[in-house]
Amino acid sequence: MHEAQIRVAIAGAGGRMGRQLIQAAMAMEGVQLGAALEREGSSLLGSDAGELAGAGKSGVIVQSSLEAVKDDFDVFIDFTRPEGTLTHLAFCRQHGKGMVIGTTGFDDAGKQAIREASQEIAIVFAANFSVGVNVMLKLLEKAAKVMGYYSDIEIIEAHHRHKVDAPSGTALEMGEAIAGALDKNLKDCAVYSREGYTGERVPGTIGFATVRAGDIVGEHTAMFADIGERVEITHKASSRMTFANGALRAALWLKTKKNGLFDMRDVLGLDVL
């Protein structure tokens, strides 16, 4: 990798998250915007990435070909769609590039492809890159160990109308953190929908509820409810810049890693708490 600073490539440069990532990359010390990518045929191809993001001229032209920019970046940052991310993953694996993956909605095969690639390249893969959310995940593990065996657990998440997957990747990660603390597999205890006559709540399950409305950036709540009291742990994001800054922080952290699969708790050192 480049000795002076980390050079990053941003996928989906014209999207909401892509523009935030470009702004963050141009502003963060130790980071250089090396490349910005958009899909073939996009009207944004040929634009200056910084100007596209509202951050001023960057000198980096939006392109569609990874091959054309392979010498311009050390770490590839991807918050797009699973099918596109897996294509980028194969390229990065072939060329020894690190990856920061914030894409959600992968099936089991997609997750396995990421695990296999991490044997050769360094990857930070997380559903949410905000510091606050990752602190919350640690709190959920601790709450579950104390209250999870006897309380009813529900996870409620809300996002903007354009989000295409549900429950959110963060909500699923919350469920996995809680289930893991209880020595369970989330697949065996998750309840993703309720409609009509459902009967009484099955003890030991983890329920999920999803809201899609307006321009909500992201809200997540885990509820531990017992008779007479309940505990709610909530995180609310008001700007995507918190995710972008976290992703760039992860890219900087990858500078010293050769291979391996990591998440934001590794980046933040939360596993020691």
UniProtKB/Swiss-Prot annotation:
The active site is at 159 (proton donor/acceptor), 163 (proton donor). Pathway: Amino-acid biosynthesis; L-lysine biosynthesis via DAP pathway; (S)-tetrahydrodipicolinate from L-aspartate: step 4/4. Coiled coil: none annotated. NADP(+) binds at residue 39. Its main location: cytoplasm. It is found in: Cytoplasm. GO terms for molecular function: 4-hydroxy-tetrahydrodipicolinate reductase; NAD binding; NADP binding; oxidoreductase activity, acting on CH or CH2 groups, NAD or NADP as acceptor. NCBIfam families: dapB. Belongs to the DapB family. Catalyzes the conversion of 4-hydroxy-tetrahydrodipicolinate (HTPA) to tetrahydrodipicolinate. This is 4-hydroxy-tetrahydrodipicolinate reductase. It comes from Salmonella paratyphi A (strain AKU_12601). The gene is dapB.
